[in-house]
Curated annotation (Swiss-Prot):
It comes from Pseudomonas fluorescens (strain SBW25). Residues 234-260 are annotated as: Disordered. This is Ribosomal RNA small subunit methyltransferase J. Disulfide bonds: none annotated. GO terms for cellular component: cytoplasm. The lineage of its organism: Bacteria, Pseudomonadati, Pseudomonadota, Gammaproteobacteria, Pseudomonadales. S-adenosyl-L-methionine binds at E125, R126, D179. It is an enzyme of class 2 (transferase). It is found in: Cytoplasm.
Length: 260
């Protein structure tokens, strides 16, 4: 995954006069222009916060991070709690809520699920545009009465995931969770929309083996890798076992038992 979307032309756009100052702030932070001829993407600032819009006649709708409404809220309320496969994969059990580093945070969906179940989460998203969407979503979540206690358990870190893990300071995370980009073939509208938008920006993860190696060196208890169900394991040490779902699976690399 490249950190800078070299092949894409990106502008920052205010969706109204009242958002110009904030748009200028994001443009300065990300080193992006406010107007760009023939832009491929527009990072838009408006009443719903920050959103990324692909431009062009066949472009999907905008993508934003929203922990208060929509899919995140539905999963928080009705998603199955600690019985969810991701909860089992990271080792959530009675009296066990591990400290988890999500080193491929993306839009923060999986990290939010784990935080809603009581895990203290650290998140790394190395693609600056996606990191900006995540930062904005966390800030808006902190303003919501019900969501604020959850996002308070989510700390966003900046930088290259591999470098951050190799140079980690302080107590290591008990569990490291990885979901590297892979050539997804799912047909759902949501996956198609997000993958169509993100793939030109982030590509796949050719350095997934180095990501796994850094995670295995840092995690104190286990590493969990989410993969499409029929995808090969990441090159390197083999997982001890896997939890299989309908469209994805979780490869488990245990180091030490998680105990209450």
């Amino acid at each position: 995954m490249s950190e800078q979307p070299a092949a894409s032309r990106i502008q920052v756009e205010a969706l109204g006069d009242g958002f110009k100052a904030r748009a200028e702030q994001w443009a300065s932070l990300l080193g992006l222009p406010l107007q760009l001829a023939d832009a491929d993407f527009s990072l838009q600032v408006g009443e719903h916060g920050l959103q990324l819009q692909q431009l062009g006649p066949d472009a999907p709708g905008p993508v934003r991070v929203d922990f208060v409404e929509g899919g995140a809220a539905h999963r928080r309320l009705y998603g199955g709690g600690s019985g969810q496969m991701i909860a089992k994969a990271v080792g959530i059990a009675q009296g066990v809520r591990p400290r988890v580093l999500d080193a491929t945070a993306g839009l923060g969906k999986d990290a939010f699920v784990l935080a809603s179940l009581g895990c203290e989460m650290s998140l790394i998203e190395r693609q600056p545009l996606i990191g900006a969407l995540l930062e904005d979503g966390l800030a808006r979540g902190a303003d919501d009465f019900e969501v604020a206690p959850i996002v308070a358990r989510m700390q966003l870190l900046k930088g290259n995931s591999i470098d951050v893990m190799r140079n980690w300071e302080g107590e290591p995370p008990q569990v490291i969770y990885l979901d590297p980009m892979f050539p997804h073939r799912e047909k759902t509208a949501l996956v198609k929309k997000e993958m169509r938008l993100f793939r030109p920006l982030v590509g796949d993860d050719p350095d997934a083996p180095a990501l796994l190696a850094a995670a295995l060196a840092l995690a104190s208890h286990r590493v969990v890798v989410k993969r499409p169900r029929k995808a090969p394991c990441i090159d390197g040490p083999k997982p001890s076992h896997a939890l299989d779902g309908k469209s994805s699976r979780y490869d488990i690399y245990p180091k030490k038992a998680l105990k209450p």
